[in-house]
Amino acid sequence: STTKIYFKSIYKISDIHEIKLNVYMDLKILEIASDTENNKNIKNYTHAAKSKNPLCGDEIQIKLVIKKEKLVDFGYQGKSCVYCQATASLLSKNLINSEKSKINEICDFAKSFFNKKQESVEKKWSFLSKLFNEKNISRKECILLPFNALKKIVSN
């Protein structure tokens, strides 16, 4: 005799769409974090800072080469989660050739976004949109860790 097993799905179609979207976003974050071109130690750095998240233990060190107020090289290293690594990777790719003032501006934007003072990602910071969304609000401290290290550098 055969036994038939019936089950009722606990998910609605809209839930399944959201689950697929969440998996897609998580895969995109993994993809970004896996771009480790600038996960390196810069020996001839001009500026450096470390940040540590006391909640989870993530830590990151950022070393920069800044010449004539312009960022010419960006290296990061640390023991951190995929969200922190993805943020550091995006920043390292997108801030090369930026003035210190622009780096300061993006650090301020990041903090204000997660403190709900910004509703959406400004066009000039669109490269951050995969990380800067409501879904990742619980990972705020992880995402902000590289920004905190950068802010220490540009504030001096």
Residue ranges, per PLM feature:
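Structured beta-strand/loop patches that form or line metal/cofactor-binding pockets in enzymes
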Residues: 35, 39-74, 78
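Active-site- and interface-proximal helix/loop "cap" or "latch" segments in soluble metabolic
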Residues: 76-136
